[in-house]
From Swiss-Prot:
Residue ranges annotated as Intravirion topological domain: 373-402
Family, as annotated: Belongs to the herpesviridae glycoprotein D family.
Location relative to the cell: Virion membrane
Origin: domain of life: Viruses
GO cellular component: membrane; viral envelope; virion membrane
Record-linked CDD domains: TM_EGFR-like
Signal peptide: 1-30
UniProt protein name: Envelope glycoprotein D
Length: 402
């Protein structure tokens, strides 16, 4: 009997251990359970004042979410690179946009605007909304998101204690993200129907961080396909949770939890490094596209003239425009012999030589002329019987003897 009782007690203890283990696993990790209740025990000493006073209206959450997938391949999407250098690091997804120019345009028209800011985690076949908020009755003379009304601030539940908006509400701060948080994030800002896309390629080290929460962004209940977005079936209210804390208060909590877990706060958050996305080959502005554009700008031919050449499709330049023909190669490769350039010293020497030669010829001509004339005079004197002699020589006079 005692043996049976011991066996029953052992089974009971084992069953209790299994139950406790199941509860712990259902919470995820001990750190998750700790983080879920610690807010009741510890609080930050003070919170910053609200950035702007606004009213939350739930009805704005009833609008279907537009697709984050871009069908227009020509559309320019800003791509940023964010890399964590070590585990358990706090990183920021920050990128400037041309929102200011849009707001100035709206301010010039003296009209308010509505906006929507949504963050997505892009997966291979679907996209998961992780943060969504709508803004209404916005004054374009103020900074973005300073609006009189807004929707509930919706977050993916597992990100509430590890993510928050930056001070301008355009960036995203991740505290100690796990390796599973690596990948592509897309920020979509919609202002009066105009959409601004920004991609962030995030890399997290594979080393385990003890305070990080693993994420399952591929959950089919939240990760929606392009077809679901196109049919207007995605409503973030159905699978995202409310967290209507003002931005400053949420960021204060995030930093408090991060330091409480042993993290080191960065001194400052910097804008993510930009990456030049390559142009798709089908849209490369090559020779044929320029020729096509010129053809499109031509006027219609007059009656009796041949039809113009049809427009060329956008494509890479053909090989004949990239490499010369064989005869052109021969012409280019064939060496061209040019006479050597004459230096300045050689030109001077030649000039002097020519001058001396001319002077010599003139001198010889003068000598010949004098000699011929003297010879002619002597010959004339001989014919007259007179010989001309010098009459003086060193002040001594001589007289011709008989």
């Amino acid at each position: 009997m005692s043996t049976f009782k011991l066996m029953m007690d052992g089974r009971l203890v084992f069953a209790m251990a299994i139950a406790i283990l199941s509860v712990v696993l259902s919470c995820g990790t001990c750190e998750k359970a700790k983080r879920a209740v610690r807010g009741r025990q510890d609080r930050p000493k003070e919170f910053p004042p609200p950035r702007y006073n606004y009213t939350i209206l739930t009805r704005y959450n009833a609008t279907a979410l537009a697709s984050p997938f871009i069908n227009d391949q020509v559309k320019n999407v800003d791509l940023r690179i964010v890399t964590a250098t070590r585990p358990c690091e706090m990183i920021a997804l920050i990128a400037k946009t041309n929102i200011d120019s849009i707001l100035k345009e709206l301010a010039a028209a003296q009209k308010t605007y509505s906006a929507r800011l949504t963050w997505f985690k892009i997966m291979p076949t679907c996209a998961t909304p992780i943060h969504d908020v709508s803004y209404m009755k916005c004054n374009p003379k103020l900074s973005f998101a300073m609006c009189d009304e807004r929707s509930d601030i919706l977050w993916q539940a597992s990100l509430i204690t590890m993510a928050a908006e930056t001070d301008d509400e355009l960036g995203l701060v991740l505290a100690a993200p796990a390796h599973s948080a690596s990948g592509l994030y897309r920020r979509v800002i919609e202002i009066d129907g105009r959409q601004i896309y920004t991609d962030f390629s995030v890399t997290i080290p594979s080393e385990r961080c003890p305070i990080a929460f693993e994420q399952n962004f591929g959950n089919p209940d939240r990760c929606k396909t392009p077809e679901q977005y196109s049919r207007g079936e995605v409503f973030t209210r159905r699978f995202l949770g409310e967290f209507n804390f003002p931005q400053g208060e949420h960021m204060t909590w995030l930093k408090f939890w991060f330091v409480y877990d042993g993290g080191n706060l960065p001194v400052q958050f910097y804008e993510a490094q930009a990456f030049a996305r390559p142009v798709p080959p089908d849209n490369h502005p090559g020779f044929d596209s320029v020729e096509s554009e010129i053809t499109q700008n031509k006027t219609d031919p007059k009656p009796g003239q041949a039809d113009p050449k049809p427009n060329q499709p956008f494509k890479w330049p053909s090989i004949k425009h990239l490499a010369p023909r064989l005869d052109e190669v021969d012409e280019v490769i064939e060496p061209v012999t040019k006479p050597p350039k004459t230096s300045k010293s050689n030109s001077t020497f030649v000039g002097i030589s020519v001058g001396l030669g001319i002077a010599g010829l003139v001198l010889v001509g003068v000598i010949l002329y004098v000699c011929l004339r003297r010879k002619k005079e002597l010959k004339k004197s001989a014919q007259n019987g007179l010989t001309r002699l010098r009459s003086t020589f060193k002040d001594v006079k001589y007289t011709q003897l008989p």
